[in-house]
């Protein structure tokens, strides 16, 4: 995990400052999503994003938020999808109020920004790479997962 600096008399370790429990040494929330009104710059909502389920020695589902290392992808229908957290989930949020409207468990860390594409069937798909990340300590993997967004007639946006 370190950086040898190739002959320098010192080295660095690039990782967050964590407690013995594997949790950040700062007061939660450790990660959140926020909606901002761009006409006046005011925060409209701020919601905790993530749990410590995959960070702590015990799988505790406390919603304290987790550090984010990837950005969201936003759909024209007003949804934001995030998978760049240190828990093994991809989540969908309603941009109007920041409420979580969907979530799926990933087989490994999804520390990346999701992608989206329009299929030949006319449906929109969300794609997540669950590859993990060695610096965050998440399990590594090699999964590429596609989720079909609901069609407009099924209540999709």
Where are these regions (language model features)?
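A fold-level detector for beta-propeller and closely related beta-sheet-rich head/sensor domains
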Residues: 1-157
């Amino acid at each position: 995990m370190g950086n040898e600096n190739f002959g320098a008399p010192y080295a660095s370790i690039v990782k967050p400052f964590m407690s013995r429990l594997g949790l950040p040494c700062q007061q939660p929330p450790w990660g959140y999503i926020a909606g901002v009104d761009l006409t006046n710059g005011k925060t409209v909502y701020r919601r905790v994003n993530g749990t410590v389920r995959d960070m702590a020695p015990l799988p505790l589902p406390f919603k304290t938020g987790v550090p984010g290392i990837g950005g969201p992808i936003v759909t024209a229908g007003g949804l934001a999808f995030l998978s760049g957290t240190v828990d093994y989930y991809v989540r969908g949020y309603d941009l109007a109020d920041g409420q979580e409207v969907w979530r799926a468990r990933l087989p490994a860390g999804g520390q990346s920004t999701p992608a989206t594409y329009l299929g030949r069937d006319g449906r929109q798909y969300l794609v997540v790479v669950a590859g993990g990340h060695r610096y965050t300590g998440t399990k590594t993997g090699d999964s590429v997962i596609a989720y079909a967004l609901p069609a407009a007639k099924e209540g999709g946006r």
